[in-house]
Amino acid sequence: MKITSIKSHVLRYELEKELGYSQQYYKHRTAHLVEVQTDEGIIGWGECFGPGNIALANKFIVEKVIQPLVIGEDPLNKEQIWQKVYNLLRDSGQKGMPIQALSGVDIALWDILGKKTNSPLYQLVGGKCNNDVPVYGYGMMLQKKSVDELILLFEEEAKQIKSKNFKAMKMKVGLGPKEDLKLVQAVRNSIGKDFKLSLIHI
């Protein structure tokens, strides 16, 4: 089997309201999907991290930098492909966009392996360890509102997340130490002391 092409698909949708985190606010979200095609007709799908216009830069790296390096390679040789691309890109940085782009291709190669062997990914990476995977509810994004307004929004959203039987939740912070403390205390009070709560600043 050989890789015949790699395509990037940058998806974008407009948000109902502007949301943000400690670094910026945004009115739309993007997702960057990577499609690796083979001569056997098996197609692998991966995803690159890259919000906003970063997805466009990653698209360029996937299609114009990585694709020429791997056309004709056997997609089942995932580790060899990863090392080849990484070693040729590492002078451009060992983190950030080159690695984000490579990760999307790598995920697609795992998808191809799973489809070729008719195996779920968990079997390919060492076997099933758990019957259940805990998930958390995520929300409480920052908005351009006063802290008092955000407290009311966050309290309500936290209650909604908890009511959906999640075992934990994650909220955004990043307004500043005093403001963040007020938001966290309000959410903690609304969900109780025993419910797991995590914070993300970025």
What are these regions (language model features)?
Residues D106-M140:
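Glycine-rich, aromatic-flanked loop segments that form ligand/cofactor-binding clefts
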